[in-house]
């Protein structure tokens, strides 16, 4: 917060004397290596208070993506700094009429595309929980372009599963600011002297080949970069599909022995092992082993 009032703030802080404005100035930059990719790290310092902000960018040319994240640091020695809002970053699109497509839904009806015209003002999508059907994925296209295999698409996603928000603000001149990160809902971050905090990453991308290429890009990026898909994973068996909530020690050991014989390397008891969990209406979140089902407890 600070500078032009027309820009949506990415960092909002309150200092000991209740000053709430930032005056961040460029101080230095460095180019680092993160695996096979380059990371640009730009240091901004406040002109009056001991707050340093690092804007970090990792370029992934193989996927036409840029990852961005922010680190804030209290470099003072005396006073705490209260962070009221800290997003992962933003990007701007030139003045035009744009349509936003994002995903919504509910249990059993996940990832339903929703498309809307972005008019002047702010369109916010957000989540206050951890459900998978609340996706931060977005795709921005010029109004009227709907071809799956051709046309401009600006796209991205926040790499975070907690409470989050994405803002799409169209200004009076038609320019579009896209920003996103942790949603500081009924919360704040207190930085003590010497303490720092790093936001989750947000990724941005662009293609001229429609939303089909967006799907392919994210599939490859998730598999090869986020999940490091080249690593060999163990063969897993999940007993949920055989027993549901009706589990007990003798039964699960018997299934595990059979699973081992066919080459399973990791056996998972998914649900029903904790107290009160006999159906999907109780017990969830009470992670105490039900000794009636597992008298000897559970351990790796």
Question: What are the residue ranges of the model-derived segments?
Answer:
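Polysaccharide-binding surfaces and accessory modules of carbohydrate-active proteins
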Residues: 1-169, 185
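Short Pro-Gly-centered flexible turn/kink motifs
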Residues: 8, 12, 17, 21, ...
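Short, hydrophobic/aromatic-enriched beta-strand segments in well-ordered soluble domains
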Residues: 42-46, 55-57, 68, 180, ...
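Terminal connector regions
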Residues: 60, 201-234, 241
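Short loop/turn motifs at secondary-structure junctions
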Residues: 66, 82, 198, 262-263, ...
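Short acidic, Pro/Gly- and aromatic-enriched capping/linker segments at domain boundaries
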Residues: 175-191
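Aromatic-lined carbohydrate-binding/catalytic grooves of carbohydrate-active enzymes
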Residues: 230-300
């Amino acid at each position: 917060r600070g500078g032009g009032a027309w820009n949506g703030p990415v960092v909002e802080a309150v200092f000991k004397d209740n000053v709430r404005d930032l005056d961040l100035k460029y101080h230095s930059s460095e180019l680092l290596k993160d695996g096979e990719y380059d990371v640009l790290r730009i240091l901004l310092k406040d002109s009056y208070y001991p707050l340093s902000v690092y804007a970090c960018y990792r370029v992934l040319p193989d996927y036409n993506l840029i990852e961005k994240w922010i680190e804030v640091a209290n470099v003072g020695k005396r006073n705490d700094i209260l962070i009221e809002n800290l997003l992962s970053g933003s990007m701007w699109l030139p003045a035009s009429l744009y349509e936003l497509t994002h995903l919504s839904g509910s249990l059993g009806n996940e990832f339903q595309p929703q498309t809307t015209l972005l008019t002047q003002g702010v369109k916010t999508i957000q989540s206050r929980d951890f459900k998978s059907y609340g996706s931060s994925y977005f795709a921005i296209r010029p109004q009227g372009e709907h071809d799956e295999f051709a046309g401009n698409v600006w796209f991205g996603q926040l790499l975070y599963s907690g409470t989050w928000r994405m803002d799409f603000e169209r200004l009076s001149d038609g320019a579009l600011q896209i920003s996103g990160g942790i949603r500081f809902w009924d919360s704040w971050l207190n930085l003590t002297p010497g303490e720092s905090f790093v936001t989750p990453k947000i990724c941005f991308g662009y293609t001229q080949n429609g939303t089909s290429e967006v799907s392919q890009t994210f599939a490859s990026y998730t598999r090869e970069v986020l999940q490091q898909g080249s690593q060999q994973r163990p063969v897993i068996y999940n007993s949920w599909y055989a027993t549901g909530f009706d589990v007990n020690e003798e039964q699960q050991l018997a299934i595990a022995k059979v699973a081992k014989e066919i080459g399973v390397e990791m056996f998972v008891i998914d649900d029903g092992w904790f107290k009160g969990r006999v159906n999907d209406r109780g017990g969830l979140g009470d992670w105490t082993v039900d000794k009636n089902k597992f008298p000897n407890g559970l351990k790796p």
